[in-house]
Regions:
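DNA replication initiation modules
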Residues: 30-56, 92-146, 179
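Generic N-terminal initiation segments characterized by hydrophobic and/or small/turn-forming residues
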Residues: 13, 17, 64, 114, ...
Length: 179
């Protein structure tokens, strides 16, 4: 059903996008299940970068994983967005602000991330599993060290289903993003 909705959105039925399920990549928990910055009780040391330029998901994936291999960034998730852009979820390095990380990662990967940074309460539309290009096992880990107060930061985790092993840590999907 999710894949069908995304195909219809891609075909021009934009109003369906608001019906997609969401997740918060930068926060694990909100007080009283109320998604607001002031109610973020478990923000995560993560930053979701949104690359709006279409058709570059595989190139962004390859460059991101190379940067990870070089020890420059920890990549948690790479997926094609509903509108065929690319989402890259990274671990925010200690002592680096989200703004600095966004700027540095954009320079390193060679594509400009959307300058509108997402706060801890901002959501991302879920996409079908076949849009997922890479998932690190670390995406599903939440440690006391990875959380801080909502006034310091923003982001959350949760995916709709387990991902394919070929899209997990240490491997690159050879499948083309959905068209």
């Amino acid at each position: 059903k999710l894949a069908d909705m995304c195909r219809k959105i891609d075909a021009g039925h934009e109003k369906l996008k608001r019906m997609l399920p969401i997740w918060t990549p930068s926060c694990a928990e909100f007080a009283n299940n109320h998604r607001a910055v002031k109610d973020a009780t478990k923000p995560l040391q993560r930053l979701m970068l949104d690359f709006d330029e279409k058709g570059h998901s595989l190139e962004i994936l390859e460059r991101s994983l190379l940067l990870q291999k070089e020890g420059k960034w920890e990549i948690l998730l790479v997926e094609e967005s509903v509108r065929k852009g690319t989402h890259v979820l990274i671990t925010l390095p200690e002592g680096v602000t989200p703004q600095e990380a966004q700027q540095r990662f954009s320079m390193d990967v060679g594509f400009q991330a959307d300058p509108a940074l997402k706060d801890v309460a901002r959501c991302i539309y879920m996409v079908p599993e076949e849009y997922t290009l890479y998932v690190s096992d670390a995406l599903f880990e939440v440690s006391p060290q990875s959380t801080q107060s909502s006034t310091e930061f923003f982001s959350c985790h949760s995916l709709p289903s387990p991902c394919h092993p070929e899209r997990s840590e240490g491997s690159v999907s050879t499948a083309q993003p959905s068209t």
